[in-house]
Protein backbone atom coordinates (compact mmCIF):
# COMPACT_ATOMS: atom_id res chain seq x y z
CA UNK A 1 0.00 0.00 0.00
CA UNK A 2 1.38 3.34 -0.96
CA UNK A 3 1.88 5.72 1.91
CA UNK A 4 0.77 9.27 1.17
CA UNK A 5 -1.72 12.03 1.77
CA UNK A 6 -5.40 11.11 1.67
CA UNK A 7 -6.84 13.70 -0.75
CA UNK A 8 -10.42 12.96 0.26
CA UNK A 9 -9.86 14.03 3.88
CA UNK A 10 -8.29 17.42 2.99
CA UNK A 11 -11.06 18.55 0.66
CA UNK A 12 -13.03 20.31 3.37
CA UNK A 13 -10.24 22.81 4.20
CA UNK A 14 -10.03 24.47 0.77
CA UNK A 15 -13.18 26.60 0.97
CA UNK A 16 -11.90 29.15 3.55
CA UNK A 17 -12.30 32.73 2.24
CA UNK A 18 -10.89 35.98 3.61
CA UNK A 19 -13.31 38.51 5.03
CA UNK A 20 -13.88 41.30 2.48
CA UNK A 21 -13.76 44.79 4.03
CA UNK A 22 -15.48 47.62 2.18
CA UNK A 23 -12.78 50.31 1.57
CA UNK A 24 -15.40 53.09 1.81
CA UNK A 25 -15.83 52.40 5.54
CA UNK A 26 -12.36 53.93 6.07
CA UNK A 27 -13.11 57.10 4.09
CA UNK A 28 -14.85 60.41 4.80
CA UNK A 29 -16.66 62.90 2.56
CA UNK A 30 -15.58 66.56 2.53
CA UNK A 31 -17.44 69.53 1.00
CA UNK A 32 -15.64 71.62 -1.64
CA UNK A 33 -16.19 75.38 -1.22
CA UNK A 34 -15.65 77.69 -4.19
CA UNK A 35 -14.44 81.32 -3.71
CA UNK A 36 -17.06 84.04 -3.24
CA UNK A 37 -16.52 85.38 -6.79
CA UNK A 38 -18.74 82.52 -8.01
CA UNK A 39 -22.49 82.35 -7.36
CA UNK A 40 -22.56 78.72 -6.18
CA UNK A 41 -20.34 78.03 -3.19
CA UNK A 42 -20.97 74.31 -2.52
CA UNK A 43 -19.68 72.78 -5.73
CA UNK A 44 -19.31 69.14 -4.77
CA UNK A 45 -17.75 66.59 -2.45
CA UNK A 46 -14.44 64.76 -2.36
CA UNK A 47 -13.40 61.51 -0.71
CA UNK A 48 -10.33 60.89 1.44
CA UNK A 49 -9.01 58.24 3.84
CA UNK A 50 -9.58 58.97 7.52
CA UNK A 51 -6.72 60.22 9.67
CA UNK A 52 -4.84 57.31 11.21
CA UNK A 53 -1.45 57.29 12.90
CA UNK A 54 0.92 59.75 11.25
CA UNK A 55 -1.27 60.11 8.15
CA UNK A 56 -3.50 63.17 8.37
CA UNK A 57 -6.55 63.48 6.10
CA UNK A 58 -6.05 67.26 5.79
CA UNK A 59 -2.57 66.77 4.32
CA UNK A 60 -3.99 64.40 1.71
CA UNK A 61 -6.62 66.98 0.70
CA UNK A 62 -4.36 70.03 0.45
CA UNK A 63 -3.12 70.56 -3.08
CA UNK A 64 -5.90 68.49 -4.64
CA UNK A 65 -7.20 70.07 -7.88
CA UNK A 66 -10.80 69.80 -9.04
CA UNK A 67 -12.20 70.84 -12.43
CA UNK A 68 -15.72 72.29 -12.58
CA UNK A 69 -17.77 73.78 -15.39
CA UNK A 70 -18.50 77.50 -15.07
CA UNK A 71 -22.15 76.69 -15.84
CA UNK A 72 -22.34 74.85 -12.50
CA UNK A 73 -20.47 77.59 -10.62
CA UNK A 74 -22.61 80.49 -11.91
CA UNK A 75 -25.87 78.66 -12.78
CA UNK A 76 -25.51 79.81 -16.39
CA UNK A 77 -25.69 77.17 -19.13
CA UNK A 78 -24.28 79.60 -21.71
CA UNK A 79 -20.90 79.35 -19.94
CA UNK A 80 -20.76 75.54 -20.06
CA UNK A 81 -17.75 75.59 -22.41
CA UNK A 82 -15.50 77.17 -19.75
CA UNK A 83 -13.79 74.80 -17.32
CA UNK A 84 -12.46 76.22 -14.05
CA UNK A 85 -9.74 74.53 -12.00
CA UNK A 86 -9.85 75.02 -8.23
CA UNK A 87 -7.06 74.06 -5.83
CA UNK A 88 -7.73 73.03 -2.21
CA UNK A 89 -5.53 75.27 -0.04
CA UNK A 90 -7.05 74.82 3.44
CA UNK A 91 -9.35 72.42 5.29
CA UNK A 92 -11.66 73.66 8.06
CA UNK A 93 -13.67 70.89 9.65
CA UNK A 94 -15.43 69.14 6.77
CA UNK A 95 -15.04 72.12 4.39
CA UNK A 96 -12.27 72.41 1.79
CA UNK A 97 -11.46 76.05 0.95
CA UNK A 98 -10.30 76.44 -2.66
CA UNK A 99 -8.61 79.06 -4.80
CA UNK A 100 -8.51 79.65 -8.57
CA UNK A 101 -5.88 77.46 -10.27
CA UNK A 102 -6.63 77.72 -14.00
CA UNK A 103 -9.19 78.08 -16.78
CA UNK A 104 -9.62 76.45 -20.18
CA UNK A 105 -12.17 75.96 -22.96
CA UNK A 106 -13.69 72.59 -23.78
CA UNK A 107 -12.28 70.95 -26.93
CA UNK A 108 -15.66 70.96 -28.71
CA UNK A 109 -15.96 74.74 -28.25
CA UNK A 110 -12.49 75.38 -29.70
CA UNK A 111 -13.19 73.11 -32.67
CA UNK A 112 -16.49 74.84 -33.37
CA UNK A 113 -14.70 78.20 -33.72
CA UNK A 114 -12.36 77.05 -36.51
CA UNK A 115 -13.90 77.57 -39.96
CA UNK A 116 -12.86 77.86 -43.58
CA UNK A 117 -11.93 81.09 -45.39
CA UNK A 118 -10.59 82.87 -42.29
CA UNK A 119 -7.25 83.35 -40.51
CA UNK A 120 -6.67 82.03 -36.99
CA UNK A 121 -4.45 84.24 -34.79
CA UNK A 122 -3.05 83.00 -31.47
CA UNK A 123 -0.84 84.57 -28.80
CA UNK A 124 0.33 83.76 -25.30
CA UNK A 125 2.09 85.85 -22.68
CA UNK A 126 3.44 85.44 -19.13
CA UNK A 127 2.23 88.15 -16.78
CA UNK A 128 2.36 88.84 -13.04
CA UNK A 129 -0.63 90.13 -11.07
CA UNK A 130 -0.44 92.73 -8.30
CA UNK A 131 -0.74 90.03 -5.60
CA UNK A 132 2.23 88.03 -6.92
CA UNK A 133 0.68 85.32 -9.13
CA UNK A 134 2.56 84.50 -12.34
CA UNK A 135 0.13 83.40 -15.07
CA UNK A 136 0.38 82.35 -18.69
CA UNK A 137 -2.57 83.61 -20.74
CA UNK A 138 -3.52 82.20 -24.14
CA UNK A 139 -5.62 84.27 -26.57
CA UNK A 140 -7.29 83.26 -29.82
CA UNK A 141 -9.07 85.26 -32.53
CA UNK A 142 -10.40 84.89 -36.06
CA UNK A 143 -10.66 87.33 -38.95
CA UNK A 144 -14.07 88.29 -40.34
CA UNK A 145 -15.48 90.08 -43.39
CA UNK A 146 -15.47 93.84 -43.64
CA UNK A 147 -18.93 95.46 -43.95
CA UNK A 148 -18.52 96.24 -47.68
CA UNK A 149 -16.56 93.11 -48.60
CA UNK A 150 -17.78 90.93 -51.49
CA UNK A 151 -15.02 88.30 -51.50
CA UNK A 152 -15.82 85.32 -49.26
CA UNK A 153 -12.25 84.75 -48.01
CA UNK A 154 -10.95 86.81 -45.07
CA UNK A 155 -7.25 85.95 -45.05
CA UNK A 156 -5.00 88.46 -43.25
CA UNK A 157 -1.47 89.28 -44.41
CA UNK A 158 1.57 88.24 -42.36
CA UNK A 159 2.28 91.86 -41.37
CA UNK A 160 -1.32 92.29 -40.16
CA UNK A 161 -1.12 89.05 -38.14
CA UNK A 162 2.06 90.31 -36.43
CA UNK A 163 0.42 93.64 -35.60
CA UNK A 164 -2.69 91.95 -34.16
CA UNK A 165 -0.55 89.55 -32.14
CA UNK A 166 1.39 92.51 -30.73
CA UNK A 167 -1.92 94.12 -29.70
CA UNK A 168 -2.86 90.86 -27.95
CA UNK A 169 0.43 90.90 -26.01
CA UNK A 170 -0.01 94.52 -24.94
CA UNK A 171 -3.67 94.25 -23.87
CA UNK A 172 -3.25 90.97 -21.96
CA UNK A 173 -0.18 92.34 -20.14
CA UNK A 174 -1.90 95.63 -19.31
CA UNK A 175 -5.16 94.08 -18.10
CA UNK A 176 -3.54 91.34 -15.98
CA UNK A 177 -0.68 93.33 -14.43
CA UNK A 178 -3.00 96.09 -13.18
CA UNK A 179 -5.21 93.86 -10.98
CA UNK A 180 -5.06 90.97 -8.53
CA UNK A 181 -6.07 87.36 -9.26
CA UNK A 182 -9.65 87.80 -8.05
CA UNK A 183 -10.27 90.79 -10.36
CA UNK A 184 -8.58 88.99 -13.27
CA UNK A 185 -10.91 85.97 -12.94
CA UNK A 186 -13.87 88.37 -12.99
CA UNK A 187 -12.54 89.73 -16.32
CA UNK A 188 -12.42 86.22 -17.83
CA UNK A 189 -16.13 85.48 -17.33
CA UNK A 190 -17.64 88.40 -19.37
CA UNK A 191 -14.65 88.20 -21.79
CA UNK A 192 -13.63 91.82 -21.16
CA UNK A 193 -10.07 91.22 -22.42
CA UNK A 194 -11.33 89.66 -25.67
CA UNK A 195 -13.54 92.68 -26.36
CA UNK A 196 -10.58 95.03 -25.80
CA UNK A 197 -8.47 93.07 -28.30
CA UNK A 198 -11.31 93.10 -30.83
CA UNK A 199 -11.68 96.87 -30.45
CA UNK A 200 -7.93 97.53 -30.76
CA UNK A 201 -7.54 95.34 -33.87
CA UNK A 202 -10.45 96.96 -35.72
CA UNK A 203 -8.12 99.36 -37.54
CA UNK A 204 -5.77 96.55 -38.66
CA UNK A 205 -8.23 93.79 -39.62
CA UNK A 206 -11.71 93.14 -38.14
CA UNK A 207 -11.82 90.17 -35.75
CA UNK A 208 -14.52 87.90 -34.34
CA UNK A 209 -14.67 85.21 -31.63
CA UNK A 210 -11.76 86.69 -29.66
CA UNK A 211 -11.25 84.88 -26.35
CA UNK A 212 -8.70 84.30 -23.62
CA UNK A 213 -9.28 80.57 -23.92
CA UNK A 214 -6.74 79.35 -21.38
CA UNK A 215 -5.03 80.55 -18.20
CA UNK A 216 -2.36 78.65 -16.28
CA UNK A 217 -0.84 79.57 -12.91
CA UNK A 218 2.92 79.10 -13.23
CA UNK A 219 3.92 80.40 -9.80
CA UNK A 220 1.92 81.35 -6.72
CA UNK A 221 3.04 83.55 -3.81
CA UNK A 222 3.53 82.23 -0.29
CA UNK A 223 0.29 80.91 1.19
CA UNK A 224 -1.58 83.53 3.24
CA UNK A 225 -4.47 82.26 5.35
CA UNK A 226 -6.02 85.71 5.82
CA UNK A 227 -6.21 86.32 2.05
CA UNK A 228 -7.84 82.92 1.48
CA UNK A 229 -10.48 83.63 4.15
CA UNK A 230 -11.06 87.06 2.62
CA UNK A 231 -11.55 85.39 -0.78
CA UNK A 232 -14.21 83.18 0.78
CA UNK A 233 -15.89 86.13 2.51
CA UNK A 234 -15.05 85.00 6.02
CA UNK A 235 -13.80 87.03 8.97
CA UNK A 236 -10.04 87.48 9.10
CA UNK A 237 -9.80 89.64 12.24
CA UNK A 238 -7.64 87.42 14.41
CA UNK A 239 -5.48 90.13 16.01
CA UNK A 240 -5.83 90.35 19.76
CA UNK A 241 -5.68 93.45 21.98
CA UNK A 242 -2.55 94.17 23.92
CA UNK A 243 -2.96 93.81 27.67
CA UNK A 244 -1.28 96.65 29.57
CA UNK A 245 -0.62 95.93 33.21
CA UNK A 246 0.81 98.35 35.72
CA UNK A 247 4.16 97.09 36.92
CA UNK A 248 4.51 96.89 40.70
CA UNK A 249 7.96 96.58 42.17
CA UNK A 250 8.08 93.84 44.81
CA UNK A 251 8.76 94.86 48.42
CA UNK A 252 12.23 94.29 49.82
CA UNK A 253 12.25 91.55 52.41
CA UNK A 254 14.07 92.33 55.67
CA UNK A 255 15.02 88.71 56.24
CA UNK A 256 15.10 85.60 54.14
From Swiss-Prot:
Pfam families, sorted: Ribosomal_S3Ae
SMART domains per record: Ribosomal_S3Ae
N-acetylalanine modifications at: 2
Subcellular location: Cytoplasm
InterPro entries to which the protein is assigned, alphabetical: Ribosomal_eS1, Ribosomal_eS1_CS, Ribosomal_eS1_euk
Annotated GO biological process: translation
GO cellular component, one term: cytosolic small ribosomal subunit
Principal location class: cytoplasm
Keywords in alphabetical order: Acetylation, Cytoplasm, Ribonucleoprotein, Ribosomal protein
Single GO MF descriptor: structural constituent of ribosome
Domain of life, per lineage: Eukaryota
Self-association state and partner proteins as the record states: Component of the small ribosomal subunit. Mature ribosomes consist of a small (40S) and a large (60S) subunit. The 40S subunit contains about 33 different proteins and 1 molecule of RNA (18S). The 60S subunit contains about 49 different proteins and 3 molecules of RNA (25S, 5.8S and 5S).
Family: Belongs to the eukaryotic ribosomal protein eS1 family.
Protein name according to UniProt: Small ribosomal subunit protein eS1
Organism for this UniProt entry: Postia placenta (strain ATCC 44394 / Madison 698-R) (Brown rot fungus)
Amino acid sequence: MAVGKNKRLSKGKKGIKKKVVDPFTRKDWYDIKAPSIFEKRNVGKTLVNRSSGLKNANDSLKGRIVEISLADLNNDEEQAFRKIKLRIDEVQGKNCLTNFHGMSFSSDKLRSLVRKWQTLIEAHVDVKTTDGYLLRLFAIGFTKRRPTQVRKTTYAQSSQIRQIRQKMFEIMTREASSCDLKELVQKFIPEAIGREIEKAARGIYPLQNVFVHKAKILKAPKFDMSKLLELHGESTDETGTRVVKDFKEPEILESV
